[in-house]
Amino acid sequence: MTQYGGPIVQGSAGVRIGAPTGVACSVCPGGMTSGNPVNPLLGAKVLPGETDLALPGPLPFILSRTYSSYRTRTPAPVGVFGPGWKAPSDIRLQLRDDALVLNDNGGRSIHFEPLLPGEAVYSRSESMWLVRGGKAAQPDGHTLARLWGALPPDIRLSPHLYLATNSAQGPWWILGWSERVPGAEDVLPAPLPPYRVLTGLADRFGRTLTYRREAAGDLAGEITGVTDGAGREFRLVLTTQAQRAEEARTSSLSSSDSSRPLSASAFPDTLPGTEYGPDRGIRLSAVWLMHDPAYPESLPAAPLVRYTYTEAGELLAVYDRSNTQVRAFTYDAQHPGRMV
């Protein structure tokens, strides 16, 4: 992880932290590349980070993408850019009885030993700390003592939160859980999920960036809003596979170039499973700036960035705020998510 939320690009290609064998479980897409580019260790096609949105300011919201065709054996669910793609917010910590598995935003699975409340572990190969909440202060002289002290008390003291950083200067990546509306059949209080997701960032000056996740419905758990360190508010427009299929069929019916309407088989309402992890079919369609304290009356009338997808849910094209196509991608029809 970089200071601004990019993928991990330093350290080993893959590692089990705390394990005596140091068995690599996947590779870092931002690491060694050559050719098209292809990672020479596994022959996986990779694309280094591409930034679609970055406004200046303290602890800004930076939206970027990285791609790797490599499939880890312990994948996180497919993210909002489709199979193979990762966004800075695509960080997930799996809580297991015998291990903590961090699915980073570079497509890797990094294994740690379980942590007790307040315990911290440092990975020399990744130059990264992973800390479990539950302690008011770190010992005097500890590398993270000042950075830990800058966190709000409710974060520091919660044993249910995990935090990661790659620098004593910060920022912290806060790994929590998304609130949800309980169902009528749920037993209350509902147990916490066996994983943690990125809920925000905090820097050494006490500034925060917050991800707002949906609490109910088809988009439950997904990020639909962001407030950055400058107080700007962004709305993330998400679509389901069924919504995109209906839009495609409606567009086909109204198009003068179409001799017959688009069939359900050509653009299905649901997506089949892939080797890239479970896929709910939810994709990021556009990002809007909804509030800017510095320019409250000068908000843009168009999205800052827009995305389109194939019938298989693969990222097809990227458009900037002038609606100009700035990137396009093609994929292997026989292997969903594999870029060509």
What are these language model-derived features?
Residues 72-86:
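Short, polar loop/linker segments at the starts of domains and inter-domain junctions
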Residues 36-38, 75, 89, 93, ...:
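Amphipathic alpha-helical interaction segments
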Residues 55-57, 94-96, 156-158:
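Solvent-exposed loop and beta-edge segments used for protein-protein assembly and interaction
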Residues 65-66, 87-90, 122:
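N-terminal targeting and processing segments
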Residues 45-50, 86-88, 94-98:
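Short alpha-helical segments and helix-capping/turn motifs at coil-helix boundaries
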Residues 49-51, 90, 304, 316:
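Generic recognition of flexible, low-complexity loop/linker segments
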Residues 1-75:
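Intrinsically disordered, low-complexity segments enriched in small residues
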Residues 5-9, 14, 29, 81-83, ...:
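Extended charged/polar low-complexity repeat regions
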